[in-house]
Amino acid sequence: MSQYDPLIDSAAARLGNALRQLGWRVTTAESCTGGGIAEAITRISGSSAWFDCAFVTYANHSKSRWVGVSEQDLQEYGAVSEPVVRAMASGALLAAEADLAVAVSGIAGPEEIGRASCRERV
């Protein structure tokens, strides 16, 4: 049995097919998944045609430094909030050479299994 979730692999493949048809590239900005989304994407043969780069910004200072999340938003809303995740996506688009950004933040709980699990996601 594969160590990877077939649903995640299937979703990544569907994303790749759609991006390839559009001629677009994607970037990711991840917190609680620790790069798991980018890993799922790069397991797909040919993903270099539609995947640009990943930002793993687990710490708040990394969210500010690498994808431009403001300290004010982090303090006002918290890292696990829609405004911060939207800012992560916007910042990733500005920093990358991509047409689409996928961003996620959440609370990783003690029951997590692997990097791609979050108890609570935004």
Descriptions of predicted regions:
Residues M1-R121:
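Short alpha-helical segments enriched in small residues
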